[in-house]
Amino acid sequence: MNPKHWGRAVWTIIFIVLSQAGLDGNIEACKRKLYTIVSTLPCPACRRHATIAIEDNNVMSSDDLNYIYYFFIRLFNNLASDPKYAIDVTKVNPL
């Protein structure tokens, strides 16, 4: 399934989950939700790419919410189809 049809919605959910963890402080629940989202992406190639990136960057073993947050911002920026959609990390406040 083409990410063009579902990508923005999934990225919105990912950043909502991260923001919620910034409010409630439950990093473990956040990581479980994020891993569930990534491991059920409708595109097998996207699922594989995201899962490998999470594993290669030790996201699931991190207790630093901002490390996880900025990881997903970098992942989003790497996958953005057009540079105009990239997130300017200099304008992002830590959670």
Curated annotation (Swiss-Prot):
Disulfide bonds join 43-46. Gene3D superfamilies: ERV/ALR sulfhydryl oxidase domain. The keyword Nucleotidyltransferase does not apply. It catalyses: 2 R'C(R)SH + O2 = R'C(R)S-S(R)CR' + H2O2. Its cofactor is FAD. It is found in: Virion membrane; Host cytoplasm. It comes from the Viruses. Residues 1-8 are intravirion. GO terms for cellular component: host cell cytoplasm; membrane; viral envelope; virion membrane. Interacts with OPG128/A2.5; this interaction involves formation of a transient disulfide-bonded intermediate, allowing disulfide bond transfer. This is Probable FAD-linked sulfhydryl oxidase OPG072. The lineage of its organism: Viruses, Varidnaviria, Bamfordvirae, Nucleocytoviricota, Pokkesviricetes. The gene is OPG072.
